[in-house]
Amino acid sequence: MILNCPHFQQQDCVSCQWLEKPYATQLTDKEIDLKRLISPFILQNFTEILPPVQSSQKQFRNKAKMVVSGSVERPILGILKDQTDPQSGIDLCDCPLYPTEFEALFPILKDFIARAGLVPYNIAKKKGELKYILLTQSRYNQSIMLRFVLKSEQKRPLVERELPNLLAKLPKDSVVSLNIQPQHAAILEGETEIFLTEKTTIEENFNDIPLFIRPQGFFQTNPNVASQLYATAQNWIKDLAIQQFWDLFCGVGGFGLHCAKALQEKNENVQLTSIEISASAIASATKSAEQLQLKNITFASLDSAQFALNEKSATPDLVIVNPPRRGIGKPLAEFLNQLGTPYLIYSSCNARTMAQDFEALSNYSLQKVQLFDMFPHTSHYEVLTFLVKKS
C-alpha cells in the first residue's frame, strides 16, 4: 500500500479505492482509460498527448467534509460506515489526504462542539442539531473556511457565545458560518448561510491570480494540481491572436482570469465574457478581476448553454468550457460547432461525457490533450484539451 491508512486496511473507509495500486500504475491506468475514450478523435501526426501532471500522494486536499456522530461530549468527525446506523461513526481526523494543519484543528472543533452544546444529529431518531462540519483551507495564507451544518438556528446563541474563543484559535482571516439544512435527508448543505465573521470569503492564490472561495461554491480540491491546470491553459493560448473570448461554466474564474491576464499583457483591449450560473461564484470572480485591475471583462450569472444559444454578438476567437460531470451537452456542443470560433479549450472531470460532446464538435480537430491527476488513489482525473477549427 502506497499510503499507510488504517481505515482502508480495516475497510472502514474505502473512498480511495486504488490505495493498493502503485502510483505509477494508477497514472498508467488513467492514461489508458483516457486514450480509449478519445481514440476516435486522436489524429496521427497532429494530436499531441502530453505527459500527465502528477499529484502529491498525501496531504493534497484542501477540504474536509466530516459527518458528525457520537455524543456532544465525545463527537466523532468522519463518516458513517452504515448510513442508517448513527452508532457506526468512523473518526477520520487522521486521514492522510488532509493538510497537516487540520490535525491540530480537529481537537479544537471537538471542544467547541461540546462547549456550544451542538448535539450530533441522530438519523435514526431524527434528533440532534449538528449534521456536518465542512472545512476548506487556503494554501496561500492558511486561512480556514469553517461551516457548521445544523438542522436549525436553535443553537445559534450558544455558538455565538463560544465564538470569540474559537476564533482566537483559528488562523487569521478565517471565515465561520452556520449552514441550515432542516431536511431529514443525506443532503450536505441547505440554502441558508449565516456568516458569524465579517469576512465571507477566504483568499487562495494560483500563479499570482487571487481566487476567492465562498460557501456553497465549487473550488478544486487539489490546489497544487489545479494551479498547474490553469497555468497550462494560459500557456497554450497566450501567443494566439485573440481579441475576445468566452469562459463558460467559469466558476470563480480560474481559467478566464489566467488567460485574460496573459492576453491583456500584450493587448489591453482583449475582451472576456465569463458565464456561471452561481451568483456567489460570479461575485468571487468579479472581486479577483478588480484586484488584478483587468479591464474589458463582463461577468454574468446565467446558465452557460442559455447564454451561448442566445448570444448575438460577434463570434469569439476562443471559447473555454469547464462543465460539471454531465458535460456541456448536445445542444451547446452543436451550437459551438456551428459558431466557428477558431479555438476551443475543454477541461473535463469526466472524459466519458467529454468524448460524447466531441462527437458533436465535428468541425474541430483535437490538437492537445493532457491528463491532470486531481484525484489520486481513485479512478477519477481531470483532462485539459485544446481543439482547433478545421480549415
UniProtKB/Swiss-Prot annotation:
EC number: 2.1.1.189
Any one GO molecular-function label of the UniProt entry: rRNA (uridine-C5-)-methyltransferase activity
Reaction equation(s) it catalyzes: uridine(747) in 23S rRNA + S-adenosyl-L-methionine = 5-methyluridine(747) in 23S rRNA + S-adenosyl-L-homocysteine + H(+)
Keyword RNA-binding: no
Catalytic center residues: 349 (nucleophile)
Positions of [4Fe-4S] cluster binding: 5, 13, 16, 95
Keywords: 4Fe-4S, Iron, Iron-sulfur, Metal-binding, Methyltransferase, rRNA processing, S-adenosyl-L-methionine, Transferase
Family annotation (Pfam families): tRNA_U5-meth_tr (PF05958)
Binding annotation for S-adenosyl-L-methionine: 220, 249, 276, 322
GO biological process assignments: rRNA base methylation
Claim: Iron is one of the keywords in the record: yes
Domain of life: Bacteria
UniProt cross-references to InterPro entries, sorted A to Z: 23SrRNA_MeTrfase_RlmC, MeTrfase_TrmA_AS, MeTrfase_TrmA_CS, SAM-dependent_MTases_sf, U5_MeTrfase_fam
SS bond partners: none
CDD domains membership: AdoMet_MTases (cd02440)
Known function: Catalyzes the formation of 5-methyl-uridine at position 747 (m5U747) in 23S rRNA.
HAMAP family, alphabetized: 23SrRNA_methyltr_RlmC (MF_01012)
Recorded family membership: Belongs to the class I-like SAM-binding methyltransferase superfamily. RNA M5U methyltransferase family. RlmC subfamily.
Name assigned to this protein: 23S rRNA (uracil(747)-C(5))-methyltransferase RlmC
Organism, as annotated: Actinobacillus pleuropneumoniae serotype 7 (strain AP76)
Gene: rlmC
